[in-house]
């Protein structure tokens, strides 16, 4: 363990990640100082009584006298107080950097604009079914630092967001993948998509194997080194999806391994997620039979293209996790019906480019129901659109227009934070309303 004794350590943010950082040091007898710009952060009640806390703002005096600052993923490095600290050469890191310094077992890491939680969960399920003791977490579920508490793990499988990668410098993995890079979080990255991409690419540093998307050059490494690259694709290469007798198949080395329709999950984007998971399991030398059986029976994660209600030949799909344009496009591309798609869009678009969404909507029978902060902006994508204040009012409007064979899709292409606690709360609200209205 790297020595932190005698250093003034400041932790910014008291969400679940910040609390994991507090506990990491507290268990090692190391004093920290905590600050959060909220007066009542969610996890304050779990903080030991003898740890100094500053609430309602950032304490600049604490920051400029610190030797180490640990920030939660939601805290921007562009915060004026952190810019001052950086100029003073004070070290600023996140929880994943702490985890990377302490972890003594092999690590697999996954990032991407979309699909990373699904892939992380798929690989985790395969590894567990193979008999491995696995710690699964990071941006999904258990904070990475909390995984260190279980000493029996043989492998860590961690999902990483771009926010976490910003403050990660020494992560070493046996395999890492960037699933895709599309416009997202542009409100966080003032220099645009290339700045966002370069942060994602940090996951390849010190990776023994890089798993890249051959269809998305933005996932390709910019620096050559001795690590191995394995590609996956929607149509070409060693690992790909191919059509055979009108069916999609997972193919490896021209061998047709699994008919995609045999899997419980649906959607072409999920077939690619399964393909990436197979690559990781091959790297781990897990028997193919275990991998393929696990993928067949993997039922997906809540709020991700999840059919939550069916009645009168009308399907209601909860895709609340689609918080960006590319994810909504992937959902729409997976739907092929004769009826109408009633698409719920709404929330904070995060300054995203909406033109790609406009193109796909023009080519399908789609009615838009727009709500929340950017409802007016979203409604301009199509002439067949309705503006409502809330998700509830949008769904009441949908009920007036439904016919047999239609699909109602919540795939908002936006952050939920303008009206909901998170995407989960939004998805749960949709599910309850669908079961009531439908």
Curated annotation (Swiss-Prot):
ATP binds at residues 112-118. Pathway: Cell wall biogenesis; peptidoglycan biosynthesis. GO terms for cellular component: cytoplasm. GO terms for biological process: cell division; cell wall organization; peptidoglycan biosynthetic process; regulation of cell shape. GO terms for molecular function: ATP binding; UDP-N-acetylmuramoylalanine-D-glutamate ligase activity. It is found in: Cytoplasm. InterPro entries: Mur-like_cat_sf, Mur_ligase_C, Mur_ligase_C_dom_sf, Mur_ligase_cen, MurD. It catalyses: UDP-N-acetyl-alpha-D-muramoyl-L-alanine + D-glutamate + ATP = UDP-N-acetyl-alpha-D-muramoyl-L-alanyl-D-glutamate + ADP + phosphate + H(+). Cell wall formation. Catalyzes the addition of glutamate to the nucleotide precursor UDP-N-acetylmuramoyl-L-alanine (UMA). Belongs to the MurCDEF family. Gene3D superfamilies: Mur ligase, C-terminal domain, Mur-like, catalytic domain, NAD(P)-binding Rossmann-like Domain. This is UDP-N-acetylmuramoylalanine--D-glutamate ligase. Its main location: cytoplasm. Keywords: ATP-binding, Cell cycle, Cell division, Cell shape, Cell wall biogenesis/degradation, Cytoplasm, Ligase, Nucleotide-binding, Peptidoglycan synthesis. Its EC number is 6.3.2.9. It comes from Wigglesworthia glossinidia brevipalpis.
């Amino acid at each position: 363990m790297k020595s932190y004794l005698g250093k003034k350590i400041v932790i910014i943010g008291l969400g679940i990640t910040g609390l994991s950082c507090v506990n990491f040091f507290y268990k090692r007898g190391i004093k920290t100082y905590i600050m959060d710009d909220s007066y009542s952060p969610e996890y304050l009640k779990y903080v030991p009584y003898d740890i100094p806390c500053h609430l309602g703002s950032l304490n600049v005096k604490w920051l400029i006298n610190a030797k180490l600052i640990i920030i939660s993923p939601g805290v921007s490095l562009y915060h004026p107080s952190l810019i001052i600290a950086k100029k003073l050469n004070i070290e600023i890191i996140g929880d994943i950097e702490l985890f990377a310094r302490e972890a003594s077992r092999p690590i697999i890491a996954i990032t991407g604009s979309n699909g990373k939680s699904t892939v992380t969960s798929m690989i985790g399920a395969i590894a567990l079914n193979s008999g491995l003791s696995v710690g699964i977490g990071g941006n999904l579920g258990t904070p990475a630092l909390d995984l260190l508490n279980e000493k029996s793990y043989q492998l860590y499988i961690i999902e990483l967001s771009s926010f976490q990668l910003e403050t990660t410098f020494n992560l070493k993995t046996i395999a890492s993948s960037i699933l895709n890079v599309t416009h997202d979080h542009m409100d966080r990255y003032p220099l645009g998509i290339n700045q966002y991409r370069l942060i994602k690419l940090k996951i390849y540093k010190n990776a023994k194997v890089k798993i890249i998307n051959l269809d998305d050059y933005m996932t390709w490494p910019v620096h050559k080194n001795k690590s191995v690259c394995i590609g996956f694709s929607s149509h070409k290469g060693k690992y790909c999806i191919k059509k055979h007798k009108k069916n999609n198949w997972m193919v490896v080395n021209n061998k047709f391994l699994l008919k995609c329709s045999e899997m419980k999950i649906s959607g072409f984007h999920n077939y690619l997620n399964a393909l990436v998971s197979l690559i990781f399991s091959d790297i781990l030398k897990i028997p193919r039979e275990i991998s393929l059986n696990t993928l067949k029976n993997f039922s997906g994660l809540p709020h991700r293209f999840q059919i939550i209600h069916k009645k009168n030949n009308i399907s209601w799909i909860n895709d609340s996790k689609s918080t960006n344009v590319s994810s909504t496009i992937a959902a729409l591309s997976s739907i092929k019906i004769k009826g109408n798609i009633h698409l719920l869009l709404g929330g904070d678009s995060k300054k995203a480019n909406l033109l790609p969404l406009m193109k796909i909507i023009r080519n399908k029978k789609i009615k838009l129901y727009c709500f929340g902060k950017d409802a007016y902006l979203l409604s301009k994508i199509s002439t067949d659109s309705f503006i409502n204040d809330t998700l509830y009012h949008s769904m009441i409007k949908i009920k007036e227009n439904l016919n047999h064979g239609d699909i109602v899709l919540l795939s908002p292409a936006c952050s939920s934070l303008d009206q909901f606690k998170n995407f989960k709360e939004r998805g749960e609200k949709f599910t309850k309303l669908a079961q009531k209205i439908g």
